[in-house]
Amino acid sequence: MKRREINFSFIIPHKNLPDLLDRCIKSIPEREDIEIIVVDDNSDEDVVNFNKFPWSKRNDVILISNKNGGGAGKARNIGLDNAKGKWILFADSDDTYTENLNGFLDSYIDSDFDIVYFKSNVINNIYNGHKDSHMNLFIDTYLSHDGNIEDVKFGAWEPWNKLIRRSIVIDNNIRFDEISSSNDKMFSIRLGCHVKNIEVSDKVIYNYILREGSIVHSALEKKFLNSFNTILDQNSLYHKIGYVRKVFIPFFLFKNRKFIDKNQLKRYLI
């Protein structure tokens, strides 16, 4: 039997969101050249029964169970270790792709770009609103010839707003930080240091969906500490490569002041 050629590997970390995961997978076209790698981060057995999912019969879905846990960063690294596609895309299990995805994939299947950045919607289910992603600002500014590509590479840092040539990731051993939050930022920034042939598309390909209970909106001190340490790493790397835009630490601390023990404030400013 001839082995199918995989052009696109979709990597989706998952934990305890079976219905939303099903919705995400259904937004990805079923094609011979696509594989969807779902890495389950030790979901609760009373919440998830993977044997009952409609997509369990799809030939393009690969389920990897990580019983040791480790968070989304660990799950994405496992996905990278198992991906076979020429291109990689990342999705969160509670998000979806737009109807533009299929044509977008066809447009770049044989291109020689290292990376293609694309636009996203933000759908706010918390306040029943819908607005453009702030990350589109970097893309729109660049496409209007008022910005530079460095701001796109280092500003549009979410993993899900880009089509990535897998060989760039493998050859440079670019990995996700295996922490509970902010695990994706340094991956994208390190990736930006290595990509040379870059395309920026005005197509809206991804729906980022805000909902109650998502880690991005969990008011946790641990999330703050992870974010703070990531910003230190981020600024250190920016300094190393000569990129002038940095995260202003006092502003970050002010914005997150409710998470900080006032007696410990000095150690963040030293």
What residue ranges belong to the model's regions?
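C-terminal subregions of glycosyltransferases and related glycan-biosynthesis enzymes
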Residues: 2, 30, 57, 180, ...
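Cell-envelope/extracellular polymer assembly enzymes that use nucleotide-activated donors
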Residues: 6-9, 27, 35, 186
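Short, well-formed alpha-helical segments that are part of the catalytic scaffolds
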Residues: 13-30
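Conserved short acidic donor-positioning loop in nucleotide-sugar-dependent glycosyltransferases
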Residues: 16, 28, 41-45, 70, ...
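Acidic donor-binding segment of Leloir-type glycosyltransferases
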Residues: 25-65
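Glycine-rich, basic loop-to-helix element that forms the pyrophosphate-binding segment
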Residues: 66-83
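Donor-binding/catalytic cores of nucleotide-activated saccharide
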Residues: 72-76, 93-198, 209-224, 228
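Short aromatic/hydrophobic "clamp" motif used to bind/position activated sugar donors
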Residues: 88
